[in-house]
Design a protein with these regions (language model features):
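Conserved strand-turn element in the central/C-terminal portion of the radical SAM core barrel
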Residues: 128-132, 191-202
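C-terminal active-site-proximal or functional interface alpha/beta core segments in diverse enzymes
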Residues: 202-203, 208-446
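Conserved anion-binding
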Residues: 135-190
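General beta-strand structural signal in soluble alpha/beta enzymes
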Residues: 67, 88-91, 111, 132-135, ...
Length: 446
């Protein structure tokens, strides 16, 4: 089987299938927006968040699920967080303000990122947020700001031992210095515990480092009297965009000839993984470290588990629609040009490719159903403005007025690298809900 005809079909939620098959819905939105747009479904996000929270309850582990806000800027997600008593992870003043404006309380906000601004630290202090301290100089600024505002709740971010070259986290020497300094500044700083973030999506390293931090919490309580009642294991919760067989076949048959201009890629996101989402959290908690499950260690030590999923909370919760502006044949394959830019499909700007297969929604008069392979380009003047280099097998030649639907794009794809290049408007986010089997839609609120 040729790679170009392989399915790589996305695993879709029922709402997404129904929405892309609802021609009247897409037609109404397309005529209103007159350009590319994103559909977001808060109900799917809420289901994902509830699943993570359910794992914590069923394992009898105290904890909080912080939505990694950087994964998508829509306000709709924040309203669901507030409804479900969740929390939000932010890394800038605008993210913090946006979160508060959508009903999430300050004490339910976690502040991460490197070298936070004074304004961000001040907001965190005023609103009772928890701050992950990443460096000694940041700690000094936090102490000074808390002295003028309110005592600051902090987690000390630990440099993972197996990632010594990471630019994030306190090495052992700095961690010891930070603890001593916090001991001197207990009027300004409350050490709630420790945090880390690991690259990749493996279960075992997260469980092992979490267990190490549980022991560190116990030692620090004894030595300094800090509460040390929580650890954060960060994000990196896996998703499965396509079925295992499709992903395996794709990798085995990968060849530059299947891409426009024989484009080659060094790596792809792992589009099929297991376990994923809340099941991965359950696997982490069930992992035996030493002679005891991590969940048991947390319970015995009375340490809460914080986590910061982004992509995993957005899995299945959005899709992106690009109107077709034109189609032409180029040698043995065609080029579809869509309204919009590849910056609205962010994976393309990581020297990679978003692989779940885009789908053609045919509009207008009937046409011959003669299959054609085509790559998909944006409407800019740049040769490399390409949304899909892979030659997709379409059931018919796309034409002006059709729509191209990219599935499952809510996690990082929609707005991570968006740009108003050529003064083109950014694709708006459209919130869709189903009531009595019919869709309603509205613009996402700022």
């Amino acid at each position: 089987m040729e790679l170009g005809s392989m399915p790589m079909l996305a695993r879709e939620r029922d709402w997404a299938i129904a929405a892309r098959q609802d021609i009247a819905l897409l037609d109404q939105i397309a005529r209103t927006i007159d350009g590319p747009f994103h559909l977001v479904n808060p109900a799917s996000f809420a289901d994902n968040l509830a699943a993570f929270q359910r794992v914590l309850r069923e394992r009898s582990v105290a904890g909080r699920v912080y939505f990694g806000k950087k994964a998508n800027k829509a306000a709709a997600w924040l309203r669901e967080v507030a409804k479900l008593d969740g929390a939000v992870d932010v890394a800038s003043v605008p993210e913090f303000v946006h979160t508060l404006a959508n009903g999430v309380r300050g004490e339910d906000v976690g502040v991460t990122g490197a070298a936070k601004s004074d304004d961000l630290l001040w907001l965190a202090s005023r609103h009772g947020a928890t701050v992950a301290i990443d460096a000694l100089d940041e700690l000094e600024r936090a102490i000074a700001i808390a002295d003028q505002a309110r005592p600051l709740r902090v987690l000390l971010r630990v440099l993972p031992p197996k990632s010594p070259n990471s630019r994030f986290g306190l090495n052992p020497t700095d961690l010891s210095a930070a603890l001593r300094r916090c001991g001197e500044a207990q009027q300004q700083i409350t050490v709630e515990g420790f945090s880390f973030h690991l690259d990749g999506y493996a279960v075992l390293p997260r469980a092992e480092l979490a267990a190490t931090l549980v022991e560190l919490c116990k030692e620090t309580r004894s030595q300094y009297g800090f509460p040390c009642s929580a650890i954060s294991i960060g994000g990196g919760f896996a998703c499965a965009y396509v079925e295992q067989d499709d992903w395996q076949n794709f990798r085995e048959r990968l060849d530059p000839s299947q891409f426009h201009a024989e484009k080659s890629f060094q790596q792809f996101y792992p589009y099929h993984q297991s376990p994923t989402g809340a099941s991965m959290l359950d696997a982490i908690l069930a992992t035996e470290v030493g002679s005891e499950m991590l969940a048991s260690k947390l319970i015995a030590a009375q340490v809460a588990l914080y986590l910061e999923p982004g992509r995993a909370l957005l899995d299945g919760a959005g899709l992106t629609v690009f109107p077709v502006q034109g189609f032409k044949r180029n040698a043995e394959h065609g080029i579809v040009t869509v309204a919009g830019l590849s910056m609205s499909l962010s994976e393309q700007w990581k020297n990679s490719e978003y692989l779940p297969t885009p789908m053609l929604v045919q509009r207008g008069p009937d046409r011959p159903q003669e299959r054609v392979r085509a790559a998909i380009g944006g409407s800019s003047c740049m040769e490399y403005d390409v949304l899909t280099w892979r030659k997709i097998l379409f059931p018919a030649a796309p034409r002006h007025g059709d729509l191209i639907v990219y599935p499952n794009t809510a996690g990082y794809q929609m707005d991570k690298n968006e740009s108003e290049f050529h003064q083109l408007a950014l694709p708006p986010k459209i919130v869709v809900s189903q009531e009595g089997g019919a869709f309603t839609w509205r613009m996402d609120q700022p």
